[in-house]
């Protein structure tokens, strides 16, 4: 292998030397573990190889499988994970059941919306024709049209019920006969079955030619009303209503209880006041307590039919007072339910916005952990880049394969017929592993394992096994004689330092991308959410400010604690900084006062001493006595006091 060949790639193989695949790293050094397959440099060798393969087409049909994918870009991924593969996904019975079940029971997308909306329109049109059949002017036309529409709807809903029952087998709890019975016991399934069976009975028994009997038309109208329940098969509206009522059950019970008490009392007092009153026609308006209750229900619900009206002024006064009180309580449940629905919708929007953050947060956590785990060279995080060797799938088998079954041969011929035209458009034939269905008996592969293999993400360091050929012919062995295969990594020790460095760089980039996506998912989605976020932030800020103020008051102290006259209040703030500073100021003031007093005394004594020295006494005895017994009031002068201190300062 020349030094210009790429030593290794991230699971990609580039047949064109001028175009390099993304995430490809080139090295000049020869790597024994990763060697690229040398490709022919001119077109003549390609044509010669193509002619040789066409000459041995019969033998290749028996022993090899040549991939004939449609034209695709120069990047050739592994055939199991190639996004350019022309193979259609395998359709099985379980797969079809799941798709039909999701289409009918879990509608998502515009196709499901169009189907279910069309069914709703058909049911609504049938109901409109049923209403028109009650009008004398449109009776004949509506009845005849309704007859044929009922036949079509019965056949359609019957077939749909059977399909729903069959498709429910894709779920584990509806598998088998007992599972189907469990599915048929669902309330909406029971309603569908009743509508279908009753419609068939009405069409068979209650019709004469193309005309319905009167009783049959009544039954058809009732069944058409039941068909409207078919629109909401999931019961989302009923669940939403039930959740709102359950959340606000306490408020609803309170208002209904008080309103019911007001209804009973108002009806009873009006009955006592109006039981003997006679109206203009000579009849009793409130002849019984039941008439009074009917009047109360009509009044407090703000319907007001006017069939029962109080006649006396006492009854009118009682009715006015109780109506204002009772009507207000009977109107409260509507407001409670309305606010509950609004809060429920807002909660669903927030939950939907929060659900968008879960994948972004999980991706961020995963990428952060992988960046952390990549720092350890012996970590198990490197195992995802290692490909396990297949035990039963050998390349270049020396022994010929046994004969395939007739079904496998037909499938191979059909695949070659569908994709044979695309093989001529390729300059280099892409040869892959045998199809999974061809090696099912020998290699033990299944459709489920194939689908799981396709879904499994491959590491970008897995070298592409490239276009391989499985053959035992001597001619093809000569063709592949000079080719060198890329050896897959089978152990962590085979990962080089540049491999690990590239993995760390890519993981760090994935971390930054996941972080950006998570920050975008965390952004508020509504103005109300922004306002709530700001109000929550303001509340947190005020809480922190109050906590800081409390700590400052605890450390510094409030002025009212240490400036108060009461000793009990002073004791509360004795350990605060303010109290200590206040005590220091008091001590400084006392010291200043004492120093002023001492200064005045010294000045007074100095004045007295100077006056006593000016008067000289002639008696020596007095002078001797004064020398031997100095006066207690005699103090040193200011200069005498300063001289030792100045001397001490000079010494220091």
From Swiss-Prot:
It is found in: Cell membrane; Cytoplasmic vesicle membrane; Membrane raft; Endoplasmic reticulum. Residues 578-609 are annotated as: C-terminal assembly domain (tetramerization). GO terms for cellular component: basolateral plasma membrane; cytoplasm; cytoplasmic vesicle membrane; endoplasmic reticulum; membrane raft; monoatomic ion channel complex; plasma membrane; voltage-gated potassium channel complex. Residues 401-414 have a biased composition (Basic residues). Coiled coil: none annotated. Residues 133-143, 209-216, 274-289, 311-312 are extracellular. PIP2 molecule is essential to activate KCNQ channels by inducing the coupling of the voltage-sensing domain (VSD) and the pore-forming domain (PD). Upon channel activation, PIP2 disrupts the VSD-calmodulin/CALM interactions, causing the release of CALM from the VSD which triggers the opening of the gate. Calcium potentiates KCNQ1 channel current through calcium-bound CALM. Calcium-bound CALM competes with PIP2 to stabilize the channel open state. Residues 393-419, 609-652 are annotated as: Disordered. It comes from the Eukaryota. The keyword Transport applies. Keywords: Calmodulin-binding, Cell membrane, Cytoplasmic vesicle, Endoplasmic reticulum, Ion channel, Ion transport, Membrane, Potassium, Potassium channel, Potassium transport, Transmembrane, Transmembrane helix, Transport, Voltage-gated channel. A 1,2-diacyl-sn-glycero-3-phospho-(1D-myo-inositol-4,5-bisphosphate) binds at residue 234. InterPro entries: Ion_trans_dom, K_chnl_volt-dep_KCNQ, K_chnl_volt-dep_KCNQ_C, K_chnl_volt-dep_KCQN1, Volt_channel_dom_sf. Residues 290-310 dip into the membrane without crossing it. Residues 1-110, 167-182, 233-250, 339-652 are cytoplasmic. Residues 228-236 are annotated as: Interaction with KCNE3. Pfam families: Ion_trans, KCNQ_channel. It catalyses: K(+)(in) = K(+)(out). One of its GO terms (biological process) is potassium ion transmembrane transport. The chain crosses the membrane at residues 111-132, 144-166, 183-208, 217-232, 251-273, 313-338. One of its GO terms (molecular function) is outward rectifier potassium channel activity. PANTHER family: POTASSIUM VOLTAGE-GATED CHANNEL SUBFAMILY KQT MEMBER 1 (PTHR47735:SF12), POTASSIUM VOLTAGE-GATED CHANNEL SUBFAMILY KQT MEMBER 4 (PTHR47735). Belongs to the potassium channel family. KQT (TC 1.A.1.15) subfamily. Kv7.1/KCNQ1 sub-subfamily. Each channel subunit contains six transmembrane segments (S1-S6) with S1-S4 forming one voltage sensing domain (VSD) and S5-S6 contributing to form one quarter of an interlocking pore-forming domain (PD). This is Potassium voltage-gated channel subfamily KQT member 1. The lineage of its organism: Eukaryota, Metazoa, Chordata, Craniata, Vertebrata. The gene is kcnq1.
């Amino acid at each position: 292998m020349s030094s210009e060949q790429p030593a290794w790639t991230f699971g990609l193989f580039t047949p064109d030397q001028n175009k390099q695949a993304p995430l490809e790293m080139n090295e000049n050094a020869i790597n024994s573990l990763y060697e690229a397959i040398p490709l022919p440099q001119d077109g003549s060798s390609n044509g010669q190889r193509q002619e040789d393969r066409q000459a041995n087409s019969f033998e290749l049909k028996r022993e090899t499988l040549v991939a004939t994918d449609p034209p695709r870009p120069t990047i050739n991924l592994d055939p199991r994970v190639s996004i350019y593969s022309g193979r259609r996904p395998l359709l099985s019975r379980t797969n079809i059941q799941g798709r039909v079940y999701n289409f009918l029971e879990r509608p998502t997308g515009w196709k499901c919306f169009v189907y279910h909306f069309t069914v709703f329109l058909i049911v609504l049109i049938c109901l409109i024709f049923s209403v028109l059949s009650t009008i004398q002017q449109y009776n004949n036309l509506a009845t005849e049209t309704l007859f044929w529409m009922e036949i079509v709807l019965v056949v359609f809903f019957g077939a749909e019920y059977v399909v729903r029952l069959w498709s429910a087998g894709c779920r584990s709890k509806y598998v088998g006969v007992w599972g189907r019975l469990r599915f048929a016991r669902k309330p909406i399934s029971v309603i569908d079955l009743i509508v279908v069976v009753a419609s068939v009975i009405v069409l068979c028994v209650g019709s004469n030619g193309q005309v319905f009997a009167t009783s049959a038309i009544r039954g058809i109208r009732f069944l058409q009303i039941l068909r409207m329940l078919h629109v909401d098969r999931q019961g989302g509206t009923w669940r939403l209503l039930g959740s709102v009522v359950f959340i606000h059950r306490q408020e609803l019970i309170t208002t209904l209880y008080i309103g019911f008490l007001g209804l009973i009392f108002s009806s009873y007092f009006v009955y006592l006041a109006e039981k003997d009153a006679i109206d203009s026609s000579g009849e009793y308006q409130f002849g019984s307590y039941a008439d009074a209750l009917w009047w109360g229900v009509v009044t407090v619900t703000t319907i007001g039919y006017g069939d029962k009206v109080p006649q006396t002024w006492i009854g009118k006064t009682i009715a006015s007072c109780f109506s204002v009180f009772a009507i207000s309580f009977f109107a409260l449940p509507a407001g409670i339910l309305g606010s509950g629905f609004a809060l429920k919708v807002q909660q669903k929007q927030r939950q939907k916005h929060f659900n968008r953050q879960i994948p972004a947060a999980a991706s961020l956590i995963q990428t952060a952990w992988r960046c952390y785990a990549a720092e350890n060279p012996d970590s198990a995080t490197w195992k995802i880049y290692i490909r396990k060797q297949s035990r039963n799938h050998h390349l270049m088998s020396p022994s010929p394969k046994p004969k395939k079954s007739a079904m496998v041969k037909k499938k191979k011929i059909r695949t070659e017929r569908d994709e044979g035209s695309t093989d001529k458009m390729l300059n280099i034939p892409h040869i892959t592993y045998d199809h999974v269905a061809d090696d099912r008996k020998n290699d033990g592969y299944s459709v489920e394992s194939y689908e799981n293999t396709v879904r499994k993400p491959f590491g970008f360091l897995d070298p592409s096994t490239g276009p391989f050929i499985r053959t035992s012919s001597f001619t093809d062995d000569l063709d592949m004689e000079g080719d060198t295969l890329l050896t897959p990594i089978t152990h962590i020790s085979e990962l080089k330092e540049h491999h690990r460095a590239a993995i760390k760089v890519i993981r760090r980039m994935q971390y930054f991308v996941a972080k950006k996506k998570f920050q975008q998912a965390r952004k508020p989605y509504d103005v109300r959410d922004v306002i709530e976020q700001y109000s929550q932030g303001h509340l947190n800020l005020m809480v922190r400010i109050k906590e800081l103020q409390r700590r400052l008051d605890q450390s510094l102290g409030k002025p009212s604690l240490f400036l108060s006259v009461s000793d009990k209040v002073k004791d509360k703030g004795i350990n605060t900084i303010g109290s200590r500073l206040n005590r220091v100021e008091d001590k400084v003031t006392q010291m200043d006062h004492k120093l002023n007093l001492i200064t005045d005394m010294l000045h007074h004594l100095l004045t007295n001493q100077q006056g006593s020295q000016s008067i000289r006494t002639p008696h020596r005895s007095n002078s001797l006595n004064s020398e031997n017994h100095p006066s207690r009031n005699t103090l040193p002068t200011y200069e005498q006091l300063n001289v030792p201190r100045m001397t001490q300062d000079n010494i220091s």
